[in-house]
Curated annotation (Swiss-Prot):
Encoding gene per record: apaH
Name of the protein this chain belongs to: Bis(5'-nucleosyl)-tetraphosphatase, symmetrical
Domain of life: Bacteria
EC number: 3.6.1.41
Gene3D superfamilies: 3.60.21.10
PANTHER family: CYTOCHROME C5, PTHR40942
Coiled coil region boundaries: none
Functional summary from the UniProt entry: Hydrolyzes diadenosine 5',5'''-P1,P4-tetraphosphate to yield ADP.
Family named by the database record: Belongs to the Ap4A hydrolase family.
GO molecular function, one term: bis(5'-nucleosyl)-tetraphosphatase (symmetrical) activity
InterPro entries xref list: ApaH, Calcineurin-like_PHP_ApaH, Metallo-depent_PP-like
Alphabetized Pfam families for the sequence: Metallophos
Length: 279
């Protein structure tokens, strides 16, 4: 059995099919971890959801910011943006079924035997991996309950940007959501900055990639390697205890798979056509 983590798809099905063919993926034998952002901006969001859902137990998915944005538009608490392609899901005959399936996906996923912990954007420096898993389950429980509509009414916003165990209600859940699905940069103390999305080296003074601060602030190395996506301008990055695998498939980069069951870190990438031009 082979186990792979695959980077952000954002509605790009043909590169996924080509990559899985290259990997000789067999759903009866192998397993895929999708790092999130299955949908939006690309041409085939609804077909991607159908494809991944049909994989059943052969696939596991963590939710990304574009996945949650789709759910918020469906809930009527957000508007689609100009370049969004979420309406193909909303208008599909099986759209409701796909959207309910999507909201039952994970915020984090771990396998101690394989030695990996998956999340869309990253793990804030102030949390251990065990704490991160617990925080993820808090938000998962709300998304899977009748309170999911109320959550989407309160999801958007950049505050609070600092974790406090005393946070409650929507503030607490918003921080958890932002940390797992939107985080790129933090300050030296781990405070979130959700405005800057450029490549490392071009950020304002006083901001650092979250994984650099995590490496510095954590008293001991993480017991599992974090695998994340979300940050296409970062690209493939192996730093300390994190492997980032969003390599910009949507923008004409590549779609990347990281093999998780191998003693050596094997990375396989497939070039992608540009489905959308960068700004």
């Amino acid at each position: 059995m082979a186990v792979y983590a695959i980077g952000d798809l954002q509605g790009c099905l043909s590169p996924l099919e080509a990559l899985l063919e290259q990997l000789r993926f067999d759903p009866a034998r192998d397993r895929i971890w999708f790092v999130g952002d299955l949908v939006n901006r690309g041409p085939d969001s609804v077909r991607v959801l159908r494809y991944v859902r049909a994989l059943g137990e052969a696939a596991v998915t963590t939710l990304g910011n574009h996945d949650l944005h789709l759910l918020a538009v469906w809930a009527g608490t957000a508007r689609a943006k100009r370049k969004d392609t979420v309406h193909q899901v909303l208008d599909a005959p099986d759209g409701e079924e796909l959207l309910h399936w999507l909201r039952f996906q994970h915020l984090t996923w771990r396998d101690d035997d394989l030695g990996y912990f998956m999340v869309h954007a990253g793990v804030p420096p102030v949390w251990s991996l065990d704490e991160a898993e617990t925080r993820g389950r808090e938000l998962e429980a709300v998304l899977r309950s009748e309170d999911y509509l109320a959550f989407f009414e309160n999801m958007y916003g950049n505050q609070p940007d600092r974790w406090d165990e005393g946070l409650t209600g929507w503030d607490r859940l918003r921080y958890i959501c932002n940390a797992f699905t939107r985080m790129r940069y933090v300050d030296a103390d781990g405070r979130l900055d959700l405005r800057c999305n450029s490549a490392p080296g071009s950020q304002p003074d006083g901001l650092y990639p979250w994984y650099e601060v995590r490496e510095r602030l954590r008293p001991e190395p993480d017991p599992l390697t974090i695998v994340s996506g979300h940050w296409s301008t970062l690209g493939l990055c192996q730093r300390g205890g994190n492997v980032a695998i969003d390599t910009g498939c949507l923008w004409g980069g590549s779609l990347t798979a990281l093999r998780l069951d191998s003693d050596e870190r094997e990375i396989i990438s497939r070039p992608c056509p540009a489905f959308l031009e960068p700004k």
